[in-house]
Amino acid sequence: MNRFILLLFCLSINQLFAQMINNESGQIFTETPFFNEKYIRSVKLKSITGTISSKKELGSIKISGKKEAYIFNENGNLTIHYLSSKNKNKSDTTFTFYEYNLKNENTIFRVSDSYGFYSYSKKYNDLGKLINKTYSREKNASKSKMNFKLEERYVIFEESYLYEEKDSIIEVTTLNSNGRPYQRQIYYYDSFNYLFKMHTRLLISNSTKQEKYTYNDRGYLKSIQYFINANETPIKELRYDYDEWGNVTFMDEYKDNVRVIHKELLYDPSTLILKTILSQDLVSNLITIIKYKPEFYN
């Protein structure tokens, strides 16, 4: 009886952290870290490395030579993402680095490109709201992209953000490098504090865009629709579905109400660690398969 109670307790604790991917605001597969650090930390996951294959219509599966990896620190934060490829025996790898403060807020987002590195440095207020972002070009003192060491930084521009809250509405004004406002965003929340609409307006041209959010019965993000100006038809839509643990199981992308991409996510049933991503381009019918292998901290 005691063992049964203990098993139920362990299952309930694991269920709290069973969502490997955090898609609360639709950040999955974006540059924003989208892994649940509590889950990553609880299973002591160090990295997942994926081999990428592809299959054309009526063709066989072919190994592309590309690799993708997500690397985490012991606190569960994503620190490195890289994507490597081989073309005519020449390899090329794009690295993305993430740094955090003591509050687990992402303070530096750094990416390698053909010219070196660029970064966004971020500052937050006491409430965790982003108040400043600086874009810079950077020089690497190391010969290795993987082991980046800052030699020089050249600030290109910066933005700052002002917040005003009115009941269930948050208004964010973006200031340019000269301290002048150029953009205003309004976030609308319902009585349960779910974001259901975000409206963006450029102050000079008065052009606008809008995002609408819907949720399923368990409160997980179900869809995001993107609109420009006064158009009533979304130019883009993302739809999601989840398993019983709250893990994203598929993601569909629509353009002008036509589905163009379908992605399925498969998890290891024993650990719920992401195992495979199947992605189909519905225009070309190209299927991409990424199979991940996990590595753990001792």
Regions found by a protein language model. Give the residues of each.
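Buried hydrophobic residues that stabilize the cores of well-folded domains
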Residues: 19-298
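Bacterial Sec-dependent N-terminal signal peptides
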Residues: 1-25
